[in-house]
Amino acid sequence: MNPYKIDFTDFFTSAFSVDCLIFGYKEGKINTLLIKRSVDPYKDRWAIPGDLVYPDEDLPVAAERILRELTGLTNIPMHQAHTFGSPLRHPQGRVITIAYF
């Protein structure tokens, strides 16, 4: 029973994603790892490695999986940096993104 009489289905319509910011240092300059997107939206554009989190997946596990699948990198220490949650930031609907670095 729902004592608040709220339709909770409205609250379960968002997706979650993880972006992995990976920095490198070469020839005195800091570099950021980018990938070329292979799917829409934004196919063939440069992006920070990121993807959706599976419904049954913990966030740190998702970050490791996404970085491995998109770049081949493994065993990279990462920490949560920031969460982006503006409702209009993604063309396909509300996506809450957790950034790792």
PLM regions and their residue ranges:
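Conserved Nudix-box catalytic region and its N-terminal flanking loop in Nudix hydrolases
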Residues: 29-76, 83-85
